[in-house]
Swiss-Prot record:
Effect of gene knockout: Cells lacking this gene show no impaired growth on minimal medium but addition of 5-deoxyribose inhibits growth at a higher level than wild-type.
Name under which the protein is recorded: 5-deoxy-D-ribulose 1-phosphate aldolase
Keyword Hydrolase: no
Named cofactor requirement(s): Mn(2+)
InterPro entries in UniProt: Aldolase_class_II_sugar_metab, Aldolase_II/adducin_N, Aldolase_II/adducin_N_sf
SMART domains xrefs: Aldolase_II (SM01007)
One GO-annotated biological process of the protein: carbohydrate metabolic process
PANTHER family, sorted: 3-OXO-TETRONATE 4-PHOSPHATE DECARBOXYLASE-RELATED, FUCULOSE PHOSPHATE ALDOLASE
Enzyme Commission code: 4.1.2.-
Species of provenance: Bacillus thuringiensis serovar kurstaki (strain ATCC 35866 / NRRL B-4488 / HD73)
GO molecular function: aldehyde-lyase activity; manganese ion binding
Taxonomic lineage of the native organism: Bacteria, Bacillati, Bacillota, Bacilli, Bacillales
Catalytic residues, chain numbering: 76 (proton donor/acceptor)
Cofactor descriptive note: Binds 1 Mn(2+) ion per subunit. To a much lesser extent, can also use Co(2+) and Mg(2+) as cofactor, but not Zn(2+).
Family membership noted in the UniProt record: Belongs to the aldolase class II family.
Amino acid sequence: MLLQKEREEIVAYGKKMISSGLTKGTGGNISIFNREQGLVAISPSGLEYYETKPEDVVILNLDGEVIEGERKPSSELDMHLIYYRKREDINALVHTHSPYAKTIASLGWELPAVSYLIAFAGPNVRCAPYETFGTKQLADAAFEGMIDRRAVLLANHGLIAGANNIKMAFTVAEEIEFCAQIYYQTKSIGEPKLLPEDEMENLAKKFEGYGQQ
């Protein structure tokens, strides 16, 4: 099979997305771009994560043509492909329906610098305007909202996070969900004190090289 490693990672991180509470049921999707081969591996549409096997993962090119796989690719394929076409620093994407991120997104709010951990994504996390799922309009809105970030909230929908590898993309999604929870909790008590913009710009640069290489 093509992209065996990427297929196995998508299966593993799909299960982790469920166990970490970042989505429910078949919601959300994951993809990995093998830039050397010019091929994308993406989770199949409507299949339970704990039932998904490596052979269920769909392999496509950047034109969205299926190269290998019998399953239908995720309905959010366009939203994944736009990043791989336009962002050379992104090779993996995790789209979640995590509860706190979705709560903030359903208010149409951006996620401000309530914690230094926001810097995993950038100085803040914008909220892209609502568009119907699975459409080019949603893909365009998501890309614009995340054009210089590593995550964006999707109004009344969820979150998408990206990075140069699947481990970091998942980490960004987890950390932003945690920050959304902190923001929700602080807003329920009072008004959170936000970190200054210059500090967040500095932290965002530090997080670019975060973790083991």
